[in-house]
Amino acid sequence: MADPTTYRPRPGEIPDAPGVYRFRDPHGRVVYVGKAKSLRSRLSSYFQDLSALHPRTQQMVTTASSVEWTVVGTEVEALQLEYSWIKEFDPRFNVKYRDDKSYPYLAVTMGEEVPRVQVMRGAKRKGTRYFGPYGHAWAIRETVDLLLRVFPVRTCSSGVYKRAAASGRPCLLGYIDKCSAPCVGRISVEDHRDLAEDFCSFMAGESGVFLRRLESEMAAASAELDFERAARVRDDINALRRVVEKNAVVLADGTDADVFALAADELEVSVQVFHVRGGRVRGQRGWVTERVEDLDDGALVERLLQQVYGPYATEKGPDGGATGVPREVLVPALPDDAVELAEWLSTLRGSRVSLRIPQRGEKRALAETVRTNAQQALALHKTRRAGDLTSRSRALSELQEELGLAESPLRIECYDISTLQGTHQVGSMVVFEDGLARKSEYRQFVVRGADGQGARDDTEAMHEVITRRFRRYLAQRDVGVAGGGSGEVPAEDDDGVAIAGPVDPETGRPARFAYPPNLVVVDGGPPQVAAAQRALDELGVSDVALVGLAKRLEEVWLPGEEYPLVLPRASEGLYLLQRVRDEAHRFAITHHRKRRGKSMTRSTLDDVPGLGPSRQAALLQAFGSVRRIRAATPEEIAAVPGFGRRTAEQVLAALAPSPDDATTEPGAVGEPGTADGAAADPDGRDAVVVPEG
């Protein structure tokens, strides 16, 4: 690991000008490429105190052993050079948007003497027009089959074409009029090229021109009483309309745009793009890539556009512009140098390109659709990855190795605290066994605090939750000692709950908190880890590993360590920790919202013994408000259906003002330690089982 100070340039050596820079490792390989409006300002930021840098940046500057730069004239030139270097050197610390599969395109080989329509994948070839990409090859074949009625362009391979030309007989498509058969001279090479140009124009979105022309031909044939020809043209029109219908009309005719969307977490980014040509979605593609750089959405968009449109720099259409660059590029966020990026795209296209965020109307609605697709793709990717047995096994092995554990963490417990300005504090405990969520083992805690009014902060709350969980585990483990050594008298924990041992004697199932975890994960950094470790130390628990995950998941904190442990971005172990932390956060938030919502809908009538929801509703319907109920006489309340004299007196007694009202916690719900949705436990147990799924 290199020391950045050993290769730090002197401030006076770095020019205060736009440019592109490269970090190299000791072997001379480029590990990172970046651009800057001011090289001096940007490069100086890499050589500040290591602890102030993002962990991923820390890893990059300590991997590198030298830095070099190139000054350019404008920021647009910097953008172009940065893309070229990323493509050339493939640096490991740069975000790379790579398709997870090769998407098929509808291709027309206009570079050949006799153009051919076909399905193509992989690298694009010079002189070939591409339309798409499509999600499936069969979708292209269906489209081509419909279009060949109107544009009977050659679709055969070179070998088939040459054999047909040598024999003087066309292939089957030539006999059924789905090929104009230039191989046997039915149509000249020039006329066939015009046919291929019309095919490309239709696919590029100029469908209205051809539909109007065919409608005129059909009307003319009908006027001449040539009904057979009119019927053929009618069928051609229907075929073209079916092709148009396959591409839903989403925007105004003539709209030429690519619509991008991102869905990201701390480790991965899901990208989706819809290609709109002539107001219709002509193609769609998406992929999920690793988030190897600490970039915001704007910077991610910049990297994305560079890699999507960069290859078009060497592909020029007949007018000198890149045919794959649309007039509009709609993105979810604008990068800092959006003006320069739009200028670069305009240079590629050969005409002005608009780069913007859609704000309203149909384009905004389409952008939301693309974003939904990106979110679903990311969720599907995570689900498939989580369900893979090999990946789970690798994750557990990596955690064992990286954390220095004696054995694989087959049981992982993660704890999170949720609160709103110090109120309704709740803690959650989620359990993963063998890399999978064990929802029947989840637990919820209502944080009490030393005075019963809640903890002062989340570190105190974390200490309380960890203490309560492991105190119960120790009590169950040592039930014989806790019961006086004889085992005949059941032990009780500090809440007065009977402890019968690790196995429930009535059901034969494992008791709550019966199993200790191999690894405890807390949501937070050093303060939360220290609080949890203090709780374990106070209880004498020394055989349970502990780590903390800060909000940025690559920061894995160990007790007593000054710096976090940085796991590789592609690590299955890090991915498992992310899932565990996210699940604990979701579970805590859900419990917190329920508890807060319940307190907001609480009625004074809830305190009346034996008064359920239906009888409360009957009272409120009869009197209109609690104030009027309090002012009523026992006889008036007893007159309400379902009430008697005794119940009426209980209602009035419960509603009578009490000196203790002023000290009652506003909105308090249930007994301490009782989770939402459950009646107050008469045993006062400190957590409740909330099975899910």
From Swiss-Prot:
Keyword tags: Cytoplasm, DNA damage, DNA excision, DNA repair, Excision nuclease, SOS response
Region called Disordered, residue ranges: 656-693
Domain annotation UVR: ranges: 208-243
GO CC term (a single one): excinuclease repair complex
Domain of life: Bacteria
Family listed: Belongs to the UvrC family.
Function comment: The UvrABC repair system catalyzes the recognition and processing of DNA lesions. UvrC both incises the 5' and 3' sides of the lesion. The N-terminal half is responsible for the 3' incision and the C-terminal half is responsible for the 5' incision.
Subunit description: Interacts with UvrB in an incision complex.
Protein name: UvrABC system protein C
Source species: Beutenbergia cavernae (strain ATCC BAA-8 / DSM 12333 / CCUG 43141 / JCM 11478 / NBRC 16432 / NCIMB 13614 / HKI 0122)
Lineage: Bacteria, Bacillati, Actinomycetota, Actinomycetes, Micrococcales
Gene: uvrC
